[in-house]
Swiss-Prot record:
Residues 78-87 have a biased composition (Acidic residues). Residues 88-97 are annotated as: Atypical RING finger domain 2. Residues 1-33, 72-122 are annotated as: Disordered. The lineage of its organism: Eukaryota, Metazoa, Chordata, Craniata, Vertebrata. This is E3 ubiquitin-protein ligase PPP1R11. Atypical E3 ubiquitin-protein ligase which ubiquitinates TLR2 at 'Lys-754' leading to its degradation by the proteasome. Inhibitor of protein phosphatase 1. GO terms for cellular component: nucleus.
Length: 122
């Protein structure tokens, strides 16, 4: 049998199922999105009693009396508390730290840092 040019036929078969509903789309599931506040950038804030150890109008935590001596492994901080009797021992300390405390002299008076506007008795 010979084909005639320019003619063609096509058959499409479509099967439709009726009576069965499509499977449910898990209607019980829900999604909860919680918004969280952005983390604030960490800032250092100095309290009014923070030492200005350079007397330049800046606050600093570099005061020599804050330093803690390294301890042997396993040594508790309470074992070395008696060592604080010597004071800070720093040659750069201008606040007069010693076993009597910040700026205290033997006579009971206090030392005045040079830039604080106090008078020098010498």
């Amino acid at each position: 049998m010979a084909e005639v040019p320019g003619t063609s036929s096509e058959t499409i078969t479509e099967t439709v199922q009726t009576g069965t509903p499509p499977p449910p789309q898990q209607e019980g599931r829900s999604l909860t999105i919680k918004l969280r506040k952005r983390k604030t950038e960490k800032k250092v804030e100095w309290s009014s009693d923070t030492v200005d150890n350079e007397h330049l109008g800046r606050r600093s935590s570099k005061c020599c009396c804050i330093y803690e001596k390294p301890r042997q492994f396993g040594e508790s901080s309470s074992e070395s508390e008696g060592d604080d009797e010597e004071g800070c021992g720093s040659a750069h300390c201008i606040l007069g730290h010693g076993r009597r405390g910040h700026g205290q002299r033997e006579g009971g008076g206090t030392t005045v840092p040079p830039s604080s506007g106090g008078t020098n008795p010498h």
